[in-house]
C-alpha cells in the first residue's frame, strides 16, 4: 500500500501571517495588508513557479513601499512553516512502521522548498519521494 500526504496544513502548518508579525501590530492589520496586495493570489503564482525576484517585482510595481516587506516573506518562510501537525506525524510514523510506502505532495515554491526542508529535515527521512 502507498499513502500520499499533503505537506502544507497536513504535515506542516502553513501560517503566512508569521512572516509579517514583526511589521504589523495585529492580525487585523496583516489581514488588511493581505487584502490590499492580493496576497493569496500572489502566493498561488509563487507556488506555480514564479521566482522570488519576479514575485517581489510584481508587488513593488504597484506598492513600492511594500517591496522589502514582501521580499522578507522569503527570508522568514521558516517562521511560516515552523509548526508540525503532530497528529499527522503520528499517523505517518505508524504507517511507516507498518511498511507502508509514504509519499508527499506539495506546492511550495522552489524558493521556499529548501527553507521548509531545512526546518523539517524529517521530511526527507520519512517520506520516500515528494511530488
Question: Where do the protein language model's features map onto the residues?
Answer:
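N-terminal helical cap/lid subdomain that shapes the substrate entry/recognition surface
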Residues: 1-90, 97-98, 109-113
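Structured helix-beta-strand junction loops
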Residues: 98-99, 126
Amino acid at each position: 500500500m502507498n499513502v500520499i500526504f499533503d505537506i502544507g496544513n497536513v504535515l506542516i502548518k502553513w501560517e503566512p501571517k508569521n512572516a509579517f508579525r514583526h511589521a504589523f501590530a495585529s492580525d487585523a492589520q496583516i489581514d488588511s495588508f493581505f487584502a490590499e496586495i492580493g496576497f493569496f493570489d500572489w502566493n498561488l503564482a509563487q507556488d506555480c513557479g514564479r521566482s522570488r525576484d519576479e514575485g517581489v517585482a510584481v508587488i513593488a510595481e504597484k506598492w513600492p513601499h511594500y517591496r522589502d516587506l514582501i521580499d522578507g516573506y522569503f527570508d522568514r518562510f521558516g517562521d511560516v512553516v515552523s509548526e508540525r501537525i503532530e497528529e499527522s506525524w503520528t499517523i505517518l510514523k505508524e504507517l511507516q512502521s507498518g511498511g507502508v510506502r509514504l509519499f508527499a505532495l506539495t506546492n511550495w515554491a522552489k524558493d521556499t522548498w529548501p527553507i521548509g526542508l531545512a526546518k523539517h529535515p524529517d521530511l526527507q527521512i520519512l517520506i520516500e519521494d515528494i511530488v
